[in-house]
C-alpha cells in the first residue's frame, strides 16, 4: 500500500494495535468486566491513565507520572457529551491509522462498506440515530490485520473489524449481524451510559480505558504504571456485569431490527452466535476475543433464534439450524472477500503456502464443491502465489477462476457485478506485481472505461493510479492515463477528504505530471489523514516556500494563476491544522 511508505517515513504508532483490539474489543464491555482480562500492554496503558485521572480528581497516586491526557472532565457529574466522545475517538484513530496492523485493502474495505452503508441507512430511517449524533459521529468501519475473530466499537462511531472475523463468516448476513451489533453499541451510546451511571471511581476507570491507549503512547515510564496497577484494579467498576449484559442484549435487539430493516437475513445473527458458540467450545486458545468482550449466554442465543423465527417469511421453525439457510444472492462476492481476508490476515510464508496449496486440487477433487467455494479457493491460491511471487502458480489459479466465470455465466449474471470485478482486480494486481503493465491495463480496461465508473469504484480508482505510476508503458500512452487518474482522484478526495491512500496516490500522480506544488499539498493531506499532523504541516510549509519561488520566477500567467489558487489552499489548510494542534495541546495542558 502507498500509505505504508508514508507510515514508514514518519514512524509507526507507539502502541500495538493488535493488543489494543484484543484487550479493548468494546470499551463498554471492559468497563463492566474490570481490568484482569487486559493484556500487559493495556494494563500499562490503563495504569498510566489512572495516574492522570486520579490527579485530576484529587486522589493521591502512589507515583506521580508526567503524562498529558485529553481533558475528559474533573468530576463524574461532567457530561460525557457527543463532542467529547467524538474527540476521543478521533484521537485514538489518529494513532490507529499509523499502526502497521491497520490495513486499507480497497477490495475488503469496499465489501465491508457495502454491508455497513445499508445498516447505517436503516438505523437512520428507524430513528436509532438522532440528527445530532448522526452529524457529530464518524460512522467509519476500518480493518485490522489479525487472525482472531473480533470486532469492536470505539468512541465517536469508529468500528474495527479483524480480518479473522471476515475469514470465518460463511455469509454476508453473519458479518452484517456483527456490524449491526457494534453499530448499536454506538447508537445507544453505551460508553457514555457506562460513565453516566457510575460514581467518580467509574469515571477514573472510564478515563483509563478510553484514554489509556493515548497515555501509553506518550509515556515510557512503566514503573509508574506498575506502581498503580493494583490501585487501578481496585478503582474499577464493581458489580456492573449485569448492566453490561443488559447492554449486550440491547445491542442484540436493536442490531437485529436494523439488520433486517436493511434487508439482511433474519437468521444471520443466530447463525453467527451458534458458530461462535460451537467454535469456542472446541478452541479456547485465545482466537475468539470477541467472546471475552461480548460474552455469549444460552439466553442470548435463544433470543436470537426466537427473533429470527418470529420474522414473517423467514421459514424458521423450532428445528431451525442457522447454518442450513440458503446462501444469499451475493454469496460469490462474500466468498471472494472471505478468501482475500484469509490470505491477508497472515502473510507469513508458511501461512501463504497453506493457501497456495489449494491449487493442487484436481477437477475431481472439487467436483462436489459449490461454485462460490471453488471460486474462493482459486482466488485465495492466486493471491497467495502472487504475494510469494510465484507467477506460474498464480497464473494456474487465475485461469481456474476465469474458467469458473466463463462456464457459469448465469450465476455471475445474477450475482453482484463486483464479484467478477474482484477477480479482474486480482488478475491486474498479479500482472502489475510482476512488471507486466501492459497486461494489467488490458485486464482492468473494461472496468475503467469511463471516468464516472472509476469514480464510483475505489478499488478500480486506486488500481488505475498504480498502473499509471508504474513503469512499462510508453510515455505517449501513459500521459493520458496519468491525467485521467489525477482528475478522478481529485474528484474522489473532494468528497472523501480523509482517504489517505487516495491522497497519497494523487500526490504521486501530480509528481509524475510535474506538478510539484499540488504533489506537496496531496502528500500533506495524506499525512494529515494518517494522524501525522507535524508531517502534514512540514509538507504544507514546503509548499509555501515552493509557491513563493514559483511566483518570483513565473512568466506564464496561467501557470501563475493555477499556482496562486493552490498556494491559497495550502495557506488555509496550514492555518486549520495549526489551530487543531494548538487546541489539542491546550487540552493536554489542562489535564496534565
Spell out what each predicted region is.
Residues 28, 33-45, 49-152, 279-281, ...:
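Hydrophobic or amphipathic, alpha-helical segments that drive membrane association/targeting
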Residues 146-172, 189:
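Active-site scaffold of zinc-dependent metalloenzymes
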Residues 173, 183-199:
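Catalytic Zn2+-binding segment of zinc metalloproteases
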Residues 108, 195-207, 224-227, 263-273:
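Acidic/histidine metal-binding catalytic segments
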Amino acid at each position: 500500500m502507498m500509505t505504508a511508505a508514508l507510515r514508514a517515513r514518519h514512524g509507526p504508532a507507539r502502541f500495538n494495535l493488535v493488543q489494543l483490539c484484543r484487550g479493548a474489543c468494546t470499551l463498554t464491555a471492559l468497563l463492566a468486566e474490570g481490568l484482569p482480562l487486559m493484556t500487559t500492554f493495556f494494563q500499562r496503558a490503563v495504569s498510566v491513565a489512572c495516574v492522570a485521572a486520579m490527579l485530576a480528581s484529587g486522589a493521591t497516586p502512589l507515583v506521580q507520572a508526567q503524562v498529558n491526557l485529553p481533558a475528559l472532565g474533573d468530576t463524574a457529574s461532567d457530561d460525557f457529551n457527543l463532542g467529547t466522545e467524538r474527540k476521543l475517538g478521533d484521537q485514538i484513530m489518529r494513532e490507529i491509522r499509523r499502526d502497521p496492523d491497520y490495513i486499507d485493502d480497497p477490495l475488503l474495505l469496499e465489501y465491508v462498506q457495502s454491508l455497513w452503508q445499508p445498516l447505517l441507512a436503516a438505523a437512520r430511517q428507524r430513528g436509532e440515530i438522532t440528527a445530532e449524533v448522526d452529524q457529530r459521529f464518524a460512522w467509519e468501519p476500518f480493518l485490522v490485520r489479525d487472525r482472531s475473530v473480533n470486532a469492536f466499537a470505539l468512541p465517536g462511531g469508529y468500528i474495527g473489524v479483524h480480518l479473522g472475523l471476515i475469514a470465518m463468516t460463511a455469509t454476508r448476513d453473519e458479518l452484517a449481524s456483527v456490524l449491526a451489533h457494534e453499530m448499536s453499541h454506538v447508537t445507544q451510546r453505551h460508553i457514555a451510559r457506562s460513565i453516566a451511571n457510575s460514581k467518580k471511581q467509574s469515571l477514573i476507570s472510564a478515563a483509563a480505558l478510553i484514554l489509556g491507549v493515548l497515555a501509553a503512547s506518550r509515556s515510557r515510564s512503566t514503573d509508574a504504571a506498575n506502581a498503580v496497577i493494583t490501585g487501578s484494579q481496585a478503582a474499577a467498576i464493581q458489580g456492573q456485569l449485569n448492566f453490561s449484559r443488559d447492554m449486550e442484549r440491547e445491542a442484540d435487539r436493536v442490531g437485529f431490527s436494523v439488520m433486517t430493516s436493511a434487508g439482511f437475513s433474519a437468521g444471520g445473527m443466530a447463525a453467527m452466535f451458534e458458530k461462535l458458540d460451537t467454535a469456542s467450545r472446541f478452541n479456547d486458545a485465545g482466537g475468539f476475543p470477541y467472546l471475552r468482550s461480548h460474552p455469549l449466554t444460552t439466553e442470548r442465543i435463544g433470543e436470537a433464534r426466537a427473533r429470527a423465527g418470529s420474522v414473517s417469511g423467514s421459514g424458521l421453525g423450532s428445528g431451525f439450524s442457522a447454518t442450513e439457510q440458503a446462501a444469499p444472492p451475493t454469496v460469490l462476492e462474500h466468498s471472494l472477500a472471505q478468501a482475500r481476508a484469509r490470505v491477508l490476515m497472515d502473510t507469513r510464508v508458511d501461512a501463504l503456502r497453506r493457501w497456495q496449496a489449494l491449487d493442487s486440487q484436481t477437477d475431481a477433487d472439487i467436483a462436489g464443491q459449490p461454485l462460490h467455494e471453488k471460486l474462493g479457493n482459486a482466488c485465495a491460491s492466486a493471491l497467495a502465489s502472487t504475494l510469494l511471487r510465484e507467477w506460474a502458480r498464480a497464473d494456474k489459479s487465475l485461469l481456474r477462476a476465469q474458467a469458473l466465470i466463463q462456464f457459469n455465466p448465469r450465476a455471475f449474471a445474477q450475482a453482484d457485478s463486483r464479484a467478477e470485478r474482484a477477480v479482474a482486480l486480482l488478475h491486474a494486481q498479479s500482472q502489475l506485481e510482476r512488471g507486466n503493465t501492459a497486461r494489467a491495463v488490458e485486464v482492468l480496461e473494461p472496468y475503467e472505461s469511463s471516468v464516472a465508473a472509476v469514480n464510483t469504484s475505489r478499488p478500480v480508482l486506486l488500481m488505475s493510479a498504480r498502473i499509471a505510476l508504474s513503469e512499462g508503458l510508453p510515455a505517449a500512452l501513459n500521459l493520458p492515463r496519468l491525467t485521467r487518474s489525477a482528475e478522478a482522484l481529485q474528484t474522489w478526495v473532494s468528497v472523501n477528504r480523509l482517504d489517505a491512500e487516495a491522497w497519497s496516490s494523487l500526490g504521486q500522480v501530480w509528481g509524475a505530471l510535474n506538478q510539484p506544488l499540488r504533489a506537496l499539498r496531496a502528500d500533506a493531506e495524506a499525512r494529515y489523514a494518517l494522524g501525522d499532523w507535524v508531517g502534514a504541516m512540514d509538507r504544507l510549509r514546503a509548499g509555501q516556500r515552493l509557491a513563493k519561488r514559483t511566483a518570483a520566477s513565473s512568466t506564464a500567467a496561467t501557470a501563475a494563476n493555477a499556482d496562486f489558487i493552490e498556494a491559497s489552499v495550502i495557506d488555509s489548510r496550514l492555518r486549520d491544522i495549526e489551530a487543531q494542534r494548538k487546541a489539542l495541546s491546550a487540552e493536554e495542558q489542562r489535564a496534565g
